[in-house]
Amino acid sequence: ACGEAAGVQGAEHSAGVAAQAGQVLLVNNAGLVSPIGPPGGQGAAAVMQAVALNVAAPLALADAWVAATAGVPDRRIVHISSGAARNAYAGWSVYCATKAALDMHARAVQLDAVAGLRIESLAPGVVDTGMQAHIRATDASQFPLVGRFQGLHRDGALQSPSDVARRLLDHVLGAAFGAEAVRDLRSI
């Protein structure tokens, strides 16, 4: 909760700097895959922590940031989404639901048609991150698809974070950004 408040205050504090810019970008990339496992064993505190980090913080930050950058002609928000937002996976009910919330937020914000604001919820694909290591270490009884993720790692099929970052920035700073509310970086 403290980090969320700091993020919102930081967005509000940046108003002076943003007013001098012609283009500003907000990337909501925080994500927590835990709790993993079926309901009944997830724990209320873990569920609430995931919802706070994966949904409440990005939405509150986006709201504060849009207000703080009102005078900037080109504002762009990208929510880093996941295939889990669009496909249900056993053991990931909380993660799927929270990522789907970001997709729906982007769709609804596009309908708001705020002047100078573009938004997308963008799934990057499977990237070689600490989250992936955590997923691969999960017991199959909690996440039946763990073998698929272990295989992607074993076969060298994970994308590097730097490659994904370059492709993501190329797209986010490009003219086509915001044409669709929900996209997959691999299809761009």
Where do the PLM segments sit?
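Active-site-adjacent segment of SDR/Rossmann-fold oxidoreductases
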Residues: N87, A108-L117
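Conserved mid-core segment of classical short-chain dehydrogenase/reductases
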Residues: V17, G22, G31-M48, G91
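Hydrophobic structural elements of the Rossmann-like NAD(P)H-binding subdomain
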Residues: V27, V78, I119-L122, Q132
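Rossmann-fold cofactor-recognition segment
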Residues: A1-A5
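Active-site helix of classical SDR
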Residues: A62, T98
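Residue(s) in the substrate-gating loop at a strand-loop-helix junction
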Residues: S82
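C-terminal helical subdomain
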Residues: S121-P124, T129, A137-I188
